[in-house]
């Protein structure tokens, strides 16, 4: 059945044998396999070998991931499978489900089929890609699962389940009537689907996986601008003061040293509203160009009464952009990826890159054909820059790029680790304004990443 020419690796055999052993004991399985180690190849080997005589539903979390998986299986196997997306005719969906042993689809389509009365009773196995995404980041004890996973898991409650992910080491918050506590995603998933877990630690101890891990060097890059730093520091002080007042009132729940405190929603509370406004304006200043940030500040100046708005220069470039191109020039980087939170910054870096003679590409949610743009970027041998917004970066991997820049970070360890691993190995430069809360945020985040994924990253200073 298999036409693949992929090298068979010891660690893959180890994982497949683990699944085989657990299935023989009627147990479900969760596989932790780091980014870049071939979860799709593991899925291929499961479907073409271990589960070749079984009826399997494989669920991918996005339409782009579904399309890439279908392409991969078409190009590398002779597997007779079907796939369902939002454009698949409902009568054809039923026919495929009845006639094919392997079906690829998304959670939404699976849920729609179940709600329409389609039965999966003759299926044997459910494979969940990125299994961590079935959990809510903040939930009540009665509502832990992201919709539509309640109905999907219910439909497969007597079947075997295989969940796979490279990021299973975060915690999720569970809110009770009087408290909030943190729970391990891995342990919650284990309990939910009655699964045995194979972790990266076990795979590293008992297989050859280490020789296939490309360690990423994370370079932390301080940026300094007197005006911007002084404004961020002023905001830091105001936010800190409000934060401590809200903590005394019980709006903020202290989750201990190992977790970030949670701010519970208090709609209509003046202090809570001001806290949100200030943190958002700080984010603008950190992640936007000064010109755009100043516009956003001006919209809120009456309510905030901050007198130093004039300190934000009205210019067409930002200190972080200056530093970015300085490093590119110094390192003589030939192909570069830049990740930004806002389209304003994407556009500014794109224009600067064009002026400096780079082949520049920008990938946002507005781009209709991501595949074509990425293909054009990859075809260029050197002197190319691809600037990406958070919407544009979903489900992307760039194994041939050695240098990536992250203009600003978010607090979620899992999401930042996934961004860092968009490239395999190489250097990831994270820019931050020094002597501000952003510096503390970046260093705290990288400590957590290093603790959770020590085999995968090395952190160095610029």
Model regions and ranges:
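Conserved helicase ATPase motor motifs in RecA-like P-loop NTPase domains
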Residues: 34-37, 132-133, 155-180
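Conserved SF2 helicase motif VI
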Residues: 411-428
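Conserved Walker A/P-loop ATP-binding site and its immediately adjacent core
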Residues: 35, 40-45, 53-75, 170-171, ...
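SF2 helicase catalytic motif II
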Residues: 107-110, 117-162
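Conserved pre-motif I regulatory segment
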Residues: 1-30
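A short beta-strand element within the Helicase C-terminal
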Residues: 122-127, 387, 394-409, 427-431
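Conserved helicase ATPase core of P-loop NTP-dependent helicases/translocases
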Residues: 88-97, 335-339, 344-351, 358-390
């Amino acid at each position: 059945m298999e036409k693949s020419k992929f090298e068979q690796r010891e660690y893959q055999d180890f994982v497949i044998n683990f699944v085989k052993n657990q299935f023989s004991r009627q147990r479900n399985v969760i596989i932790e396999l780091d980014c870049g180690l071939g979860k799709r190849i593991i899925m291929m080997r499961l479907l073409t070998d271990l589960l070749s005589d079984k009826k399997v539903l494989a669920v991918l979390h996005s339409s782009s991931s579904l399309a890439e998986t279908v392409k991969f299986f078409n190009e590398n196997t002779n597997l007779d499978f079907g796939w369902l997306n939002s454009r698949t005719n409902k009568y054809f969906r039923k026919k495929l489900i009845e006639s094919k042993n392997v079906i690829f689809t998304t959670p939404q389509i699976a849920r729609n089929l179940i709600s329409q009365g389609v039965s999966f009773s003759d299926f044997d196995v459910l494979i969940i890609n990125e299994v961590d995404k079935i959990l809510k980041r903040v939930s009540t004890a009665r509502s832990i699962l992201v919709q539509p996973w309640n109905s999907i898991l219910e439909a497969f409650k007597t079947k075997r389940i295989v969940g796979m992910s490279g990021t299973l080491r975060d915690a999720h918050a569970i809110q009770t009537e009087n408290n909030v506590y943190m729970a391990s995603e891995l342990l919650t998933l284990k309990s939910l689907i009655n699964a045995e877990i194979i972790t990266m630690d076990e795979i590293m101890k008992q297989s050859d996986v280490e020789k296939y891990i490309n360690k990423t060097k994370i370079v932390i890059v301080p940026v300094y601008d007197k005006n911007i730093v002084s404004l961020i520091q002023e905001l830091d002080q105001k936010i800190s003061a409000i934060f401590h007042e809200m903590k005394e009132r019980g709006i903020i729940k202290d989750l201990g040293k190992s977790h970030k405190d949670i701010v519970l929603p208090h709609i209509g509370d003046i202090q809570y509203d001001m806290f949100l406004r200030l943190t958002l304006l700080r984010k603008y200043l950190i992640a936007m160009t000064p010109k755009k940030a100043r516009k956003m500040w001006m919209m809120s100046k009456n309510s905030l009464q901050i007198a130093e708005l004039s300190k934000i220069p009205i210019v067409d470039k930002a200190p972080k952009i200056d530093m970015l191109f300085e490093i590119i020039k110094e390192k003589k980087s030939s192909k570069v990826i830049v990740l930004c939170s806002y389209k304003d910054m994407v556009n500014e870096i794109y224009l600067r890159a064009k002026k400096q003679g780079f082949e520049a590409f920008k990938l946002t949610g507005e781009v209709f054909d991501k595949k074509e743009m990425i293909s054009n970027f990859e075809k260029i041998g050197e002197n190319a820059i691809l600037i990406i917004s958070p919407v544009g970066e979903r489900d992307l991997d760039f194994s041939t790029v050695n240098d990536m820049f992250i203009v600003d970070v978010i607090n979620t360890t899992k999401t930042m680790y996934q961004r860092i691993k968009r490239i395999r190995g190489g250097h990831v430069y994270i820019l931050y304004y020094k002597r501000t809360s952003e510096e503390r945020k970046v260093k705290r985040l990288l400590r957590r990443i290093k603790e959770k994924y020590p085999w995968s990253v090395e952190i160095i200073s610029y």
